[in-house]
């Protein structure tokens, strides 16, 4: 089945990194190939512009895709956003030149020229406000257009605000908040492949910032060690084959490890081993 991934832009690299982390690795290195087999035998990647992915998924020819919430809203496509991903966050804002003195959308003059690639979002937003504006469709960078006198304002995604600042622009309104989403054709929401992909992505995210800690504990010190060892539910405890010693292991937040290790040693733990967690399926 086909999984659409961004072929360009700010979502491309983090999307491919996420898929690799969950075990979906492209098996072809030729970037000119639009359809690429992967290490998951039931998944092929199809490279597409992020703004086109909602349409591809809606068609049913493509089972799922990763794109921005802003592109989903702009397209108006009938797709299910089954999972919000932890990248691509930003705000779709209206921004004007700092020198304009405009501080709100209400201050925009009648017929103000708004440059954007989010034409549908812009039209609906200003229509709801009852503002008469002229929408200028742009497919590339919009930030320079006010400087050129082509637009009075822009409507675009702001991640950090640095690009706006460089071009002398300031945001005056937030239209919507966005982030990367896993989108699925509605008929595939309950499909086994969708459930598998969602499970592995959630498992990858759940493992972030956590480590697996293994330690050996003499029976006489077991209660003292368990009293200081955090766990998701309860630490796992196994009696070793020799001696009156137990192996204890637990999933632990990484940020508590420095102090925790010292407390465990003081409580009587020894042979402490700390390992990464690739995925945590809950």
Swiss-Prot record:
The entry sums up its family as follows: Belongs to the ATP phosphoribosyltransferase family. Long subfamily.
- Could you identify this protein by its name? ATP phosphoribosyltransferase
Q: Name one GO cellular component term.
A: cytoplasm
Q: Which reaction does it catalyse?
A: 1-(5-phospho-beta-D-ribosyl)-ATP + diphosphate = 5-phospho-alpha-D-ribose 1-diphosphate + ATP
Supply the InterPro entries for this chain.
ATP-PRT_HisG_long, ATP_PRibTrfase_cat, ATP_PRibTrfase_CS, ATP_PRibTrfase_HisG, HisG_C, N-reg_PII-like_a/b, N-reg_PII/ATP_PRibTrfase_C
Q: What GO MF terms are annotated?
A: ATP binding; ATP phosphoribosyltransferase activity; magnesium ion binding
Which PROSITE patterns does the UniProt entry name for this protein? ATP_P_PHORIBOSYLTR (PS01316)
Cofactor(s) the protein requires to work: Mg(2+)
Q: Where is this protein localized, as stated in its record? A: Cytoplasm
Q: Does the keyword Membrane apply?
A: no
**Annotated organism of origin:** Pyrobaculum aerophilum (strain ATCC 51768 / DSM 7523 / JCM 9630 / CIP 104966 / NBRC 100827 / IM2)
Alphabetized UniProt keyword annotations: Amino-acid biosynthesis, ATP-binding, Cytoplasm, Glycosyltransferase, Histidine biosynthesis, Magnesium, Metal-binding, Nucleotide-binding, Transferase
Q: In which pathway does it act?
A: Amino-acid biosynthesis; L-histidine biosynthesis; L-histidine from 5-phospho-alpha-D-ribose 1-diphosphate: step 1/9
Where is the major localization of this protein?
A: cytoplasm
EC id? 2.4.2.17
Q: Which SUPFAM superfamilies match?
A: GlnB-like, Periplasmic binding protein-like II
What regulates this protein's activity?
Feedback inhibited by histidine.
């Amino acid at each position: 089945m086909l999984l659409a991934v961004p072929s360009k832009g700010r979502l491309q690299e983090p999307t491919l990194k996420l898929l690799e982390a969950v075990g979906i690795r492209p098996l072809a290195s030729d970037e000119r190939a639009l359809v690429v087999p992967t290490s998951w035998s039931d998944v092929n990647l199809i490279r597409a512009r992020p703004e086109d992915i909602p349409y591809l998924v809606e068609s049913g020819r493509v089972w799922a895709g990763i794109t921005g919430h802003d592109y989903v809203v702009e397209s108006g496509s009938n797709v299910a956003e089954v999972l919000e991903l932890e990248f691509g966050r930003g705000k779709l804002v209206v921004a004007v030149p700092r020198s304009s003195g405009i501080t709100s959308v209400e201050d925009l003059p009648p017929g103000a020229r708004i440059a954007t690639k989010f034409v549908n979002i812009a039209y609906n937003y200003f229509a709801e406000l009852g503002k008469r504006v002229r929408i200028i469709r742009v497919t590339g960078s919009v930030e320079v257009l006010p400087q050129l006198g082509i637009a009075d304002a822009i409507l675009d995604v702001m991640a950090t605000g640095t690009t706006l600042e460089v071009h002398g622009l300031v945001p005056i309104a937030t239209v919507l908040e966005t982030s990367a989403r896993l989108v699925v054709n509605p008929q595939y929401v309950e499909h086994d492949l969708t459930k598998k992909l969602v499970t592995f992505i959630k498992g990858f995210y759940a493992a972030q910032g956590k480590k697996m800690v293994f330690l050996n504990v003499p029976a006489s010190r077991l209660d003292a060690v368990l009293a200081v060892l955090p766990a998701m539910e309860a630490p796992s405890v196994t009696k070793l084959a020799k001696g009156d010693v137990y192996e204890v292991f637990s999933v632990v937040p990484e940020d508590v490890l420095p102090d925790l290790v010292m407390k465990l040693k003081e409580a009587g733990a020894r042979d402490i081993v700390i390992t990464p967690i690739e995925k945590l399926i809950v």
